[in-house]
Amino acid sequence: MTDTWLIVGLGNPGTEYSNNRHNVGQMVLDELARRVGGSFKVHKARAHVLEGRLGIGGPRVVLAKPMSYMNVSGGPVSALSKFYDIDPEHVVAVHDEIDIPFNTVKLKIGGGEGGHNGLRDISKALATKDYLRVRVGVGRPPGRMDTADFVLKDFATTEKKDLPFLLDDAADAVETVVREGLAAAQQKYHTAVQ
């Protein structure tokens, strides 16, 4: 297997979804693409892909935004991991997380999917839950609002001013985990004042 990392930003395709909370993973990938340099190209695995390094001499990464809907992300992720010969331990899924407050980033490996159908599909396709997750907090829906309706809406006006900072923090978390490991990233992002 290779030392390359597959970094996957989860979301839904199409401009009507591009600013939704559910697409925050793909927004983070756009920030990482800016850092890597270059532009995404269509890959036969049904994903937009950018290959490069995170910094000079940094780890080799494949940034990927599946062209499928969120809930069926597993096929493209599995196909890319096979194409690039990447073990699940080197797969990082960047996704929205309603159980974490907005403007917060958490990391973990394995465990449950917390009702996140995109993660569930990736776990099924990879035949393991043991891949890394960068969980980008979008908060819980207000009142009795349906969770699906909440994540399929754009960020609130009050959140939009802080969104660039959240995307930057999440991209930094991805860089930390691939450069220094999960423990270092968790120490930084689970104990830091956000």
Curated annotation (Swiss-Prot):
EC supergroup of this enzyme: hydrolase
Record-level GO BP terms: protein quality control for misfolded or incompletely synthesized proteins; rescue of stalled ribosome
Catalytic reaction equation(s): an N-acyl-L-alpha-aminoacyl-tRNA + H2O = an N-acyl-L-amino acid + a tRNA + H(+)
Binding site for tRNA: Y17, Y69, N71, N117
Residues annotated as transmembrane: none
Annotated catalytic residues: H22 (proton acceptor)
Marked site positions, Discriminates between blocked and unblocked aminoacyl-tRNA: N12
InterPro entries per the UniProt record, alphabetical: Pept_tRNA_hydro (IPR001328), Pept_tRNA_hydro_CS (IPR018171), Pept_tRNA_hydro_sf (IPR036416)
Subcellular location: Cytoplasm
A GO molecular-function descriptor: tRNA binding
Cellular component per GO, a single term: cytoplasm
Family indicated by similarity: Belongs to the PTH family.
Subunit and partners: Monomer.
Primary role: Hydrolyzes ribosome-free peptidyl-tRNAs (with 1 or more amino acids incorporated), which drop off the ribosome during protein synthesis, or as a result of ribosome stalling. Catalyzes the release of premature peptidyl moieties from peptidyl-tRNA molecules trapped in stalled 50S ribosomal subunits, and thus maintains levels of free tRNAs and 50S ribosomes.
PANTHER family on file: PEPTIDYL-TRNA HYDROLASE (PTHR17224:SF1)
Protein name: Peptidyl-tRNA hydrolase
The organism of origin for this protein: Arthrobacter sp. (strain FB24)
Lineage: Bacteria, Bacillati, Actinomycetota, Actinomycetes, Micrococcales
Gene that this sequence comes from: pth
